[in-house]
UniProtKB/Swiss-Prot annotation:
Protein name: Glycerol-3-phosphate acyltransferase
Cellular component terms per the entry's GO annotation: plasma membrane
General function of this protein: Catalyzes the transfer of an acyl group from acyl-phosphate (acyl-PO(4)) to glycerol-3-phosphate (G3P) to form lysophosphatidic acid (LPA). This enzyme utilizes acyl-phosphate as fatty acyl donor, but not acyl-CoA or acyl-ACP.
Enzyme Commission identifier(s): 2.3.1.275
Pathways per UniProt: Lipid metabolism; phospholipid metabolism
Length: 202
């Protein structure tokens, strides 16, 4: 790995892009409660689903994934090495987790991390999405689904395109570290299960 002005610029740009909190902005635009103070307190798509419904959560998920996908794809097209790609992707996730524009209080970084992995190929994107959805259907724990999918991601990548195993493993490690408290709650049986906002009957 060679640190160049281009690499440093991409790292900074990725962090700043990641710092744009899609959850907070979507909730403000739609007149919803602040996701940092409602539900689980996590400004991410899953919590927005709880407090705002499917369409709001879908918007948050799309933009959170885009924050990871764009920097990773641009860095790849610029010919940066795999370690640099991993660091740039992590910078986008760290922006989401510690956003400079929102008092450094952000989310878990799952969607942004998976978004950064997605440009590797549609097969990987489908495997990641399928693994997460399957785990949610089986256990109803969004956090456990994210952890299991993160653990599987390097193996999927090794099978599909082993050039990117290292950056994917770096992102997977970050996801698992960010879920330390969730793991503790899962072990104690105290973790909240996946749910969405119920539409009032008329």
């Amino acid at each position: 790995m060679t640190i160049t002005a281009l690499t440093l610029g991409m790292i900074l740009s990725a962090y700043l892009a990641g710092s744009i909190s899609s959850a907070v902005l979507v909730c403000r635009l739609r007149g919803l409660p602040d996701p940092r103070t409602q539900g689980s307190g996590n400004p991410g798509a899953t919590n927005v689903l709880r407090i705002g419904g499917v369409s709001s959560a879908a918007l948050v998920l799309f933009f959170d994934m885009l924050k990871g996908a764009l920097p990773a794809y641009i860095a790849f097209r610029l010919g940066l090495d795999s370690v640099s790609l991993g660091i740039i992707a992590i910078a986008a996730c760290l922006g989401h987790i510690f956003p400079i524009f929102f008092h450094f209080k952000g989310g878990k970084g799952v969607a942004t991390a998976f978004g950064a992995m997605a440009p590797i190929g549609p097969e990987l994107a489908l495997l990641l999405m399928g693994s997460w959805v399957l785990m949610v259907l089986i256990c109803r724990y969004s956090s456990l689904a994210a952890i299991v999918t993160a653990l599987l991601a390097p193996f999927y990548t090794w099978y599909l395109d082993d050039r990117f195993v290292l950056p994917v493993a770096m992102l997977s490690a970050l996801i698992i570290i960010r879920h330390k408290e969730n793991i503790q709650r899962l072990l104690k049986g105290e973790e909240s299960k996946f749910s969405r906002k119920k539409t009032p009957k008329t």
